């Protein structure tokens, strides 16, 4: 079942997809979005960034103890042309280094 999160259909679809994945894994998934149907940035670029952030949050949550798992998302317009994305999730506390880079 598709839940409706915002007026922008493309962004709504991305969030709905990750909401369904979180539900399938019984991870609490909370969303607060205040965006118009048309945004001031390229939708494709925005959705690529959003998908990457949500994928990382889901992967990190799956690696933590069940009682700590959660994903909280806030997306809103700030000023006239800025969009702020805030994603909070639990993680196992291990910061991984790859080729000397975190």
Regions found by a protein language model. Name each.
Residues 1-5, 40, 66-68:
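Short flexible loop/turn segments at helix-to-beta-strand junctions
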Residues 45-66:
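Conserved ATP-binding N-box helix of the HATPase_c
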Residues 7-23:
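Short beta-to-alpha transition helix within the HATPase_c
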Residues 3, 30-49:
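Conserved short strand/loop->alpha-helix "switch" segment adjacent to the catalytic nucleotide/phosphoryl-transfer site
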Residues 68-81:
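Short beta-strand/loop element within the Bergerat-fold HATPase_c
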Residues 82-102:
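Glycine-rich/acidic phosphate-handling loop/turn and adjacent ATP-lid/helix
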């Amino acid at each position: 079942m598709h839940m409706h999160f915002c007026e922008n259909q493309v962004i709504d679809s991305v969030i709905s997809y990750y909401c369904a994945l979180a539900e399938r894994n019984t991870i609490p998934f909370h969303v607060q979005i205040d965006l118009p149907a048309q945004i001031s940035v390229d939708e494709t670029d925005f959705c690529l960034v959003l998908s990457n952030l949500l994928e990382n949050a889901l992967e990190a949550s799956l690696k933590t103890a069940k009682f700590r798992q959660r994903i909280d998302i806030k997306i809103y317009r700030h000023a006239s042309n800025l969009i702020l994305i805030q994603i909070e999730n639990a993680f196992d506390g291990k910061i991984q280094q790859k080729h000397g880079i975190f």
